[in-house]
Amino acid sequence: LCEGDAVSIIEHMSDSMATRAAEQLGDAVDARVRAEVAEAVAIADYATAHEWHSGDPYDVIGTRPVRLGADGTPLLDEFVALELAALKQISIAAATWLIRDILNLRDRHPQLWQQVQDGALPVFRACQLVQEVARWGLDAGQA
């Protein structure tokens, strides 16, 4: 081997390593997006499993319904945020805000929710958008 051949081999190895690393990074990003979407859908499903319906009986002493989201979102069991906080190992306040954002996204902005599910819009960005819209105080029809 002459010096030029060694340099060429090293450059080729570096290029192939960089290509592999770029592919690994792309795969990791895709996996993260899929995981974030799956988590958002799971949170929405978890909230649905804890919905209160208008005919459901409740007592002042027992579990009560609460509305975590804005107008047009369902009433939920008051302990749903506590349970989600335990499952995700986050604070109750963070769980409450997360449920609020996901419910607002799913129930008040279905087209945006679909974009999130398709992976076209990051979950965090969609949550920022629904937080901003919620500040306007619109009812479900206006949102």
List each language-model region with its residue ranges.
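Peripheral, non-cofactor segments flanking catalytic/redox cores
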Residues: 1-143
